[in-house]
From Swiss-Prot:
InterPro entries: RuBisCO (IPR033966), RuBisCo_large_chain_AS (IPR020878), RuBisCO_lsu_C (IPR000685), RuBisCO_lsu_C_sf (IPR036376), RuBisCO_lsu_fd_N (IPR017443), RuBisCO_lsu_N_sf (IPR036422), RuBisCO_lsuI (IPR020888)
Origin: domain of life: Eukaryota
Gene name linked to the record: rbcL
Annotated function: RuBisCO catalyzes two reactions: the carboxylation of D-ribulose 1,5-bisphosphate, the primary event in carbon dioxide fixation, as well as the oxidative fragmentation of the pentose substrate in the photorespiration process. Both reactions occur simultaneously and in competition at the same active site.
Protein name per its UniProtKB record: Ribulose bisphosphate carboxylase large chain
Residues marked Transition state stabilizer (site): 324
Amino acid sequence: VGFKAGVKDYKLTYYTPDYQTKATDILAAFRVTPQPGVPPEEAGAAVAAESSTGTWTTVWTDGLTSLDRYKGRCYHIEPVAGEENQYIAYVAYPLDLFEEGSVTNMFTSIVGNVFGFKALRALRLEDLRIPPAYSKTFQGPPHGIQVERDKLNKYGRPLLGCTIKPKLGLSAKNYGRAVYECLRGGLDFTKDDENVNSQPFMRWRDRFLFCAEAIYKAQAETGEIKGHYLNATAGTCEEMTKRAVFARELGVPIVMHDYLTGGFTANTSLAHYCRDNGLLLHIHRAMHAVIDRQKNHGIHFRVLAKALRMSGGDHIHSGTVVGKLEGERDITLGFVDLLREEYIEKDRSRGIYFSQDWVSLPGVLPVASGGIHVWHMPALTEIFGDDSVLQFGGGTLGHPWGNRPGAVANRVALEACVQARNEGRDLAREGNEIIPVASKW
């Protein structure tokens, strides 16, 4: 018959160390921890097989297609320095395996099934190389960094934000008042917390109205463009779109979405709506630590960040390096560059396993948020540079005199740090002197 049934080792078909990767391949770097007795080549090949064309046995229908054309290939394996029984397995996927413009489909293929695999003790997706041929099928961020600056008329400094606290329990009117005080004091943006959607104590429509009122009042009094990230995340895509439409009708500049809990399909729909209707889109990464916190299992945040740039968002939370949530400096700056820059060189010391060419896909502003305050300002200005959003929740509202003085303090500290930097002073060394001097006037 010509068909030979039976179970074969994956590595016979899917481990191909002599394979030359193509410019159109999607490349993945997996951190593989095989079960005892499973050779790393077999583990790497198993990942390649199960995330592409393979199954546990040879099947009759394999003969009806060209496996060589469609199969994923594990083309290189290296041990992880300093770790026992951990390997980086590099896998190449032919572009034809993926639907155009669908982050959902890309993830379903690459990480959909392999993580429960018996032969592996643990598996982590460390990085993806997205070829231009694939990234060009995505719209990407609704507007990007330059267009956002032009819309807001704010240049040469990071933007300032603040998450309104207490995150749950305020009425819409009181919430709007808190927004107004922060914006009036000098912040560029205020923010709905990620879990503020439409609860019994504050329905979304009421919140949108009072926040819009606060924005327009603060704009009129300061002469600056202001915004509040109105969280459009909802239980259905239709409801989410309804909220975004209402925000557009109010004439506000920006809405917000929780892209991991909301899902990539919803996020991409919202990003398309935002581009078509001139809304900026702020992205919160609620649930990311469930996926990315374990060092040897899950998906590294740099992959989730790349996926967001493809799906679409103008801001995304990216850790602080200095605040209350964890993040190592070089690694964080690695994916901050992946969000902002057009071309990023491979650099293993920053966790970047592949050179990434975004071919003019718009950039995303990284948002530093979580446990930061005025005294972190010199470090944040130096680490993140101008193209970022610095978000102080408790660091604004926790000011002993209240919201507006807290906002003033943040704006003064930021302007002082930017000026000092532009004058050539060393923020890391002199930061603690710059801020008290600025606060005197």
